[in-house]
Amino acid sequence: MALFRKKDKYIRITPNNSLKGSVSQVIPEVPDELFAKCPACKHMIYKKDLGLAKICPTCSYNFRISAQERLTLTVDEGSFQELFTSIETKDPLRFPGYQEKLQKAKETTGLHEAVLTGKAMVKEQKIALAIMDSHFIMASMGTVVGEKITRLFELAIEENLPVVIFTASGGARMQEGIMSLMQMAKVSAAVKRHSNAGLFYLTILTDPTTGGVTASFAMEGDIILAEPQSLVGFAGRRVIETTVRENLPDDFQKAEFLQDHGFVDAIVKRTELRDKVAHLVAFHGGGQ
């Protein structure tokens, strides 16, 4: 009877010994540079879908971008003239491993230091421009960063130019000790001289802007803009919670929180910053 028919045996498959070895020989690998994981929504994104502005298509998170990428998004093509490239740190404290760290940062970013400075045109408005790059030792402010920004303000005074700075920093550069902290006062004094000359100063806070940069020139602009969801603060969240012994709001130190409390004038989408900068510079009688 069919009910008691002997079951057929399973098909036997002889393993292919040629496939033995590393997994990479069997499973094709997807190159890491093709995809990026959004830190906010955790989605995996095909990098080409981020566009030049590097904005997550799912949650609109703004990825951190380099100074060169920021330059491309902001200024008129071919208008940027880089300045003060010959200034280099002398490692005043002979801090162990500092020179090696500097060299690696230079090779990785293609920059001489953590800030790119120069003159440029934004929709035919001439400006003195500084762009900080968090990929260079977290854009920490040392003597060279302070000197370059100070010289930029001095040049702007001489040439009657508005100053526009895109800030991003982890704070003062610990490898240079007290000399890095002195840059806060040094740059702030230059900002004051520029203001006394009746010239316009615009700051755009990007993620992250913290420490001594926040406590000095980042918050001294005549108008202060910020990119959405940028981290902006002085001390770290855990330090503050330990000090005040209170739990802080989830959005504490976010750009939107600062705007709600009067520290930021406006939150501007990255794709709209070029137009906004040009409009504000022109409105305040900026460079022609």
UniProtKB/Swiss-Prot annotation:
EC number: 2.1.3.15
Main localisation: cytoplasm
UniProtKB keywords: ATP-binding, Cytoplasm, Fatty acid biosynthesis, Fatty acid metabolism, Lipid biosynthesis, Lipid metabolism, Metal-binding, Nucleotide-binding, Transferase, Zinc, Zinc-finger
Binding residues for Zn(2+): 38, 41, 56, 59
A single GO cellular-component term on record: acetyl-CoA carboxylase complex
Highest taxon of source: Bacteria
Subcellular location: Cytoplasm
Cofactor descriptive note: Binds 1 zinc ion per subunit.
GO biological process entries: fatty acid biosynthetic process; malonyl-CoA biosynthetic process
Molecular function as annotated in GO: acetyl-CoA carboxylase activity; ATP binding; carboxyl- or carbamoyltransferase activity; zinc ion binding
Residue intervals of every C4-type zinc finger in the record: 38-59
Pathway info: Lipid metabolism; malonyl-CoA biosynthesis; malonyl-CoA from acetyl-CoA: step 1/1
Catalytic activity: N(6)-carboxybiotinyl-L-lysyl-[protein] + acetyl-CoA = N(6)-biotinyl-L-lysyl-[protein] + malonyl-CoA
Start and end residues of each CoA carboxyltransferase N-terminal domain: 34-288
Cofactor(s) it depends on: Zn(2+)
Purpose: Component of the acetyl coenzyme A carboxylase (ACC) complex. Biotin carboxylase (BC) catalyzes the carboxylation of biotin on its carrier protein (BCCP) and then the CO(2) group is transferred by the transcarboxylase to acetyl-CoA to form malonyl-CoA.
Family from the record: Belongs to the AccD/PCCB family.
Subunit structure as annotated in this protein's UniProt entry: Acetyl-CoA carboxylase is a heterohexamer composed of biotin carboxyl carrier protein (AccB), biotin carboxylase (AccC) and two subunits each of ACCase subunit alpha (AccA) and ACCase subunit beta (AccD).
Protein name: Acetyl-coenzyme A carboxylase carboxyl transferase subunit beta
Organism (species): Streptococcus dysgalactiae subsp. equisimilis (strain GGS_124)
Gene: accD
